[in-house]
């Protein structure tokens, strides 16, 4: 921009983001660039990606080889998407239990404590970015999964989960409750 580089920080500005635009507007390329920049700035020990691509896998295929990419799911295997969302819910439950056992209110506090004293404080788990290209198609194909995604979005800030949803038309696909947690 005219004032210099634009920075989007999911921790400071998020926790979640909505990328919207018509066909050919560059949504997928913007999302790819953003994820590549995150991978460039943070190690796989700091951030992991779960990529859900409802365009058959074409968008995120270039990111699959990154050590940050934990999973790439497509509309070609609908059962895998359901299992992945259930798995993410389990990960968040374990994080919540770990935070409680260690006495930290949220992942950011755990990260700060580890940074100050890496010998005494164990390393926190990586932040988890769930990026969904063609969110509307996912919502239509898996309407039951929207409840799980809503719960994940609500818990995301404190537990280190960040949802990035890309879609042509957010209305009808992204609920008001979910939008309330999407600050970017």
Map each language-model feature to its residues.
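P-loop NTPase catalytic phosphate-binding loop
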Residues: 1-111, 120-184
């Amino acid at each position: 921009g005219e004032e210099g580089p634009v920075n989007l920080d999911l921790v400071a500005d998020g926790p979640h983001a909505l990328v919207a635009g018509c066909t050919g507007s560059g949504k997928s390329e913007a999302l790819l660039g953003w994820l590549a920049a995150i991978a460039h700035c943070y190690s796989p020990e700091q951030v992991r990606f779960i990529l859900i691509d409802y365009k058959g896998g074409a968008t995120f295929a270039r990111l699959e080889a990154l050590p940050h990419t934990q999973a790439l799911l497509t509309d070609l295997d609908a059962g895998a998407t359901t299992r992945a969302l259930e798995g993410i819910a389990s990960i968040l439950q374990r994080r919540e239990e770990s935070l409680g056992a260690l006495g930290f209110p949220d992942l950011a506090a755990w990260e700060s404590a580890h940074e100050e004293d890496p010998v005494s404080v164990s390393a926190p788990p990586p932040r988890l970015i769930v990026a969904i290209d063609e969110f509307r198609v996912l919502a239509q194909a898996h309407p039951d999964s929207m409840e799980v995604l809503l719960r994940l979005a609500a818990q995301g800030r404190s537990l280190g989960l960040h949802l990035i949803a890309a879609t042509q038309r957010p209305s009808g696909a992204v609920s008001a409750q979910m939008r309330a947690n999407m600050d970017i």
